[in-house]
């Protein structure tokens, strides 16, 4: 018997690095997108934590009235936030080296821009990494497609909206009450509740929650018995088992009789596609709505659309919402404007004399 021995070519350091980065045997897959994702997300997370705890007040409106957002400056977990970059900076790229000092950079809200830009780059790379790992494992690419919905939403509120409004100071603050403030001001200025794309997003989120609960409860209620009454039903499943763990025919029959036959899926694959697609498409539309309202293509305006035979206005809910919008608008940035935009835009009456 003849044995043939081949000398294995030594791989270069770069080659070994490439193999390690793209290996699916690592406990956590890195991938080429991960090479960029890891430092950007670590940077965004580190700066966010430091700024949330210790950042000094920021002159968000550019009128020399700093707003405190950090814990060490009197806030708690609910009221605290990383304050957006000052309106005095606008959309300018504002890294540390562009400021005269670190104190000036902090006063103008430099950390917000640093966090947001690194975060958006990081989550986009996370989405790319999902596709990359799917590709290496021979899977279909829909995990990354589903994740594109929250990526689009984050990009809309942190980047597209500030671009449309002309300043990063209009971006969403990085905190709980700051998020609510952003939502209230957005409603006041853009009437988002009357925008059809936002309505589709609400249907996507609430509908997705309903369908998830329905699916989970149906599956849990139609498990194939593998245990006794004294054991948890969860013990009847073994990871990787070939048999079905629940009876889809029973679930289909139950739901078809509860509502009607064609309301129930008889194909597990189409069912799970629907469960994924419904909320994803809804959030896509919401992100698209935010991106159009960024350039002031706002929600429907039905104000004073119903009048009686004498021309007097009969108020509808649209008029009630409009009054609420005006109230919210006069409250925000109260020292930055003499009048809210909706009131200041009306031509002043002429006076005789």
Curated annotation (Swiss-Prot):
Question: What GO molecular functions are on record for this protein?
Answer: chlorophyll binding; electron transporter, transferring electrons within the cyclic electron transport pathway of photosynthesis activity; iron ion binding; oxidoreductase activity, acting on diphenols and related substances as donors, oxygen as acceptor; oxygen evolving activity
Q: Which residues carry this modification: Phosphothreonine?
A: 2
Q: Where is this site: Tyrosine radical intermediate?
A: 161
Q: What is its EC number?
A: 1.10.3.9
The enzyme's main class, written as a single word, is oxidoreductase
Which residues are [CaMn4O5] cluster-binding?
170, 189, 332-333, 342, 344
Q: Which residues cross the membrane?
A: 29-46, 118-133, 142-156, 197-218, 274-288
Give membrane topology per the record: Multi-pass membrane protein
The record's HAMAP family line, in alphabetical order, gives:
PSII_PsbA_D1 (MF_01379)
Subunit structure of this chain's protein: PSII is composed of 1 copy each of membrane proteins PsbA, PsbB, PsbC, PsbD, PsbE, PsbF, PsbH, PsbI, PsbJ, PsbK, PsbL, PsbM, PsbT, PsbX, PsbY, PsbZ, Psb30/Ycf12, at least 3 peripheral proteins of the oxygen-evolving complex and a large number of cofactors. It forms dimeric complexes.
Entry protein name: Photosystem II protein D1
Q: What is the organism of origin for this protein? A: Lemna minor
